[in-house]
């Protein structure tokens, strides 16, 4: 036997494969027999090597594009590391905006000992939180420039530039401070706690 067009089914009956047919979509003669649809000899299934589509001889063609479906192995490969680098660069670019000028409101409460601290974006009594009343300030602000009303705390009005906040390793730690009354000048002093 030169051709392997003969196969057997479960009952060991010899069946001959049907001859190749012309593809009804691209009219190519490069087709091959795949199998019998529903194990009926009257419904042979073919696959076209040119357009990579299967069809049943004598059956109705479905409305499928001529280009057909590619195998997953033929799809273009996507380099996952380059995709993750692009996403990371886009996230970093979006996070590089300088704090949106502190659009959140800051609530203020001052104790009788005039000790005030910032925890997160809210002021609380420093002595109750940390038991500290005096510490070395890092940044000071004049009280007449602060607005303790219901308006938002604007970053650019208080000498806090975006360069002071970006890249600071202490920015994620709580900030403490106190009000100091020297020479009748009201100053609000802040420090970074380690």
Swiss-Prot record:
Q: Where in the cell is it found?
A: Nucleus
InterPro entries reported for this sequence = Dof, Znf_Dof
Q: Which GO terms describe its biological process?
A: cotyledon development; mucilage metabolic process involved in seed coat development; positive regulation of DNA-templated transcription; regulation of DNA-templated transcription; regulation of secondary shoot formation; seed coat development
Q: Where is the signal peptide?
A: none
Q: Listed GO cellular component terms?
A: nucleus
This protein's major location comes to nucleus
Q: What is this protein called?
A: Dof zinc finger protein DOF4.2
Q: Which organism is it from?
A: Arabidopsis thaliana (Mouse-ear cress)
Q: What's the source species' lineage? A: Eukaryota, Viridiplantae, Streptophyta, Embryophyta, Tracheophyta
Q: Which gene encodes it?
A: DOF4.2
